[in-house]
Amino acid sequence: MLTSHFPLSFAGHRLHIVDFDASSFHEHDLLWLPHHDRLRSAGRKRKAEHLAGRIAAVHALRRWASGVPGIGDKRQPLWPDDLFGSISHCASTALAVISRQRVGVDIEKIMSQHTATELAVIIDSDEPQILQASSLPFPLALTLAFSAKESVYKAFSDRVSLPGFDSAKVTSLTATHISLHLLPAFAATMAERTVRTEWFQRGNSVITLVSALTRWPHDRSAPASILSAIPR
């Protein structure tokens, strides 16, 4: 499969971006993956996306380790001990990031006005006003809300069950970051906390990234991070 890779410094991390041509994918490309048998029943598009994501992950891992991240029983990437990572893909782009802290990354295509109007009904009653106050086009702002929540979930996916969109509320949105207030539906041990997620636009997509403590955030001996407790 034809790919191009380039690294990008963002929010204190090194993102590894892989643009790929899914039409150039061949089944034998998967033989590079130790777990290729697990993908036997996947569709062609899914196989190409998975491969591109793992290529991005291998580039991201080279600073610390070698090899291809495996695949867990919930289809999650398996990272080396003491490392955290995240993979995302959208259309013809995949990206990955590795850190010694919890990290989550997401890429989403910016919604059309029609899609944003349809999906606006599922957000919290306070969120439309916050998104509109940002001065960003509403489709972009709503896409960022979805993407930021996905990034936060990825950072803690081993600790929480799959949360719904209403398990976190947008509290602010600027040209560089979006803040989320976590509710008990996200995880009881993380409720009433605020997460700041960094973002930037790349073409017709947005990329969001959150980095959090390796230890559970209520551990006051841990250093400060993007994830912080709101006043109690």
Curated annotation (Swiss-Prot):
It catalyses: apo-[aryl-carrier protein] + CoA = holo-[aryl-carrier protein] + adenosine 3',5'-bisphosphate + H(+); apo-[peptidyl-carrier protein] + CoA = holo-[peptidyl-carrier protein] + adenosine 3',5'-bisphosphate + H(+). It holds the Pfam family 4PPT_N. Its cofactor is Mg(2+). Mg(2+) binds at D106, E108, E150. It is found in: Membrane. It comes from the Bacteria. Belongs to the P-Pant transferase superfamily. EntD family. Involved in the biosynthesis of the siderophore enterobactin (enterochelin), which is a macrocyclic trimeric lactone of N-(2,3-dihydroxybenzoyl)-serine. The serine trilactone serves as a scaffolding for the three catechol functionalities that provide hexadentate coordination for the tightly ligated iron(2+) atoms. This is Enterobactin synthase component D. It comes from Salmonella austin. The gene is entD.
